[in-house]
Amino acid sequence: DFGEFYCGVVDLTNPEAFEWFKDIIKEYTLGIGIDGWMADFGEYLPTDDICLYSGKSPMIEHNHWPVLWAKCNYEAVKESGKLGDVVYFMRAGGAGSQKYCTLLWAGDQSVDFTIHDGLASVICGALSAGMMGCGLTHSDIGGYTSLFDNTRTKELFLRWAEMAMFTPFMRTHEGNRPDTNFQYYDDEDTMERLARLVDVYTMLAPYTKTLVEENADSGHPVQRPLFMHYESDAKAYDIQYEYLFGRDMLIAPVYEQDKHEWDVYLPQDEWVHLWTGEEYHGGAITVSAELGYTPAFYRKNSEFADIFEEIREKYGVK
């Protein structure tokens, strides 16, 4: 009982049931031309009062279930000859999911600025996932879950979107209460602001593509903790809410409301502020962080500096 609907769980330990579900994906998803979908749930196997075909305890099988669900999707795509042409994203996973899951998303965050289940939570969530081998992650822009009087604001939506442009996958979601949550189409100003952010995301594509390729080749996540490239910096190990977007960019998302400035920590390097061109050499700094200009920096000697400079020329602070 999900509160608003009922559902059942197919016993994926049963080979016939596994093949049946795989055929459903082939026929009714791939078969009608769909090349991307949300492979939702995966974590709802009951832990008591059921008997599985495998004979294993559901308590033991519970954490393995997301792997079976990912494998079912993966094999459907592979057997249809569409690996590399199809992306499905999942919210549940663990050891073993890495081979079968093409993309993670962070699940159903609250539509707010709370530290443990709002915007901030997807930052450290992406870093944790990346360090366990799931290097391609993203989240619902604006969050998903509205309960009681908790509703998405315009500011939250835009702060989330400005972070999402520095992730491998940028995707909006209306949330579970579309009529009461702020949507990008609610006013012209937001549509213009979002169009700018999406264009930046598009301009970054040559750089982002190399990060995705690196993830496939070496396993390095697209979003990385600072200590991954600055091992000798003791402070880097304490930073949870900033991340390296590949080797050459550092992003410090604004995850609190009503902020116009933001404190940032930069490891020792030659950094250039994406929006102003101001140069920094590392350490603790405070920078302007107006809506739409989340603190973002790139390494001065990056081979992609021309792209970053083009972004500043088109959308930077004049």
Model-identified regions with their sequence ranges:
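Catalytic-domain carbohydrate-binding cleft regions of carbohydrate-active enzymes
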Residues: 1-309, 315-317
